[in-house]
Swiss-Prot record:
This is Ribosome-binding factor A. Disulfide bonds: none annotated. It comes from the Bacteria. PROSITE patterns: RBFA. One of several proteins that assist in the late maturation steps of the functional core of the 30S ribosomal subunit. Associates with free 30S ribosomal subunits (but not with 30S subunits that are part of 70S ribosomes or polysomes). Required for efficient processing of 16S rRNA. May interact with the 5'-terminal helix region of 16S rRNA. PANTHER family: RIBOSOME-BINDING FACTOR A, CHLOROPLASTIC-RELATED. GO terms for cellular component: cytosol. Pfam families: RBFA (PF02033).
Length: 121
């Protein structure tokens, strides 16, 4: 299938899924969740949904479990909003790139402040 179409379908699902998670999902386990990326398979049967979840490790696991439990509801809502013959099955994956970037940024800040202290000495 055309890679451009697959990419557009992924972006559309990402946009609509973000809206549904903000406004429509009432599961208390699902906390502050951000959809960072959606990778759709070439046959449009499977969509890997990468999410960033704010909170402790325990809260992240609970939110991921809540999202997996709400998969049917989310597919139904996306089906109403996105015109596709078949809505892909969602697989939710935790996106740790934001946490990784934050760790790198804090390390760089620490190195910078150490360098400034050495310059002052």
């Amino acid at each position: 299938m055309n890679k451009t179409r697959i990419s557009r379908v992924g972006e559309e699902i990402k946009k609509e899924l973000s809206l549904v998670l903000q406004r429509g999902l009432k599961d208390p386990r699902v906390g502050f969740v951000t959809v960072t990326d959606v990778e759709v398979s070439s046959d449009l049967q499977l969509a890997k949904v990468f999410v960033s979840i704010f909170g402790s490790e325990e809260e992240r696991k609970a939110s991921l479990a809540g999202l997996t439990k709400a998969k049917g509801y989310l597919r139904t809502e996306i089906g109403k909003r996105v015109k596709l013959r078949h809505i892909p099955d969602f697989v939710f994956k935790l996106d740790e790139s934001i946490d990784y970037g934050s760790k790198i940024e804090s390390i760089l800040r620490e190195i910078s402040t150490e360098g400034e202290k050495q310059d002052e000495s």
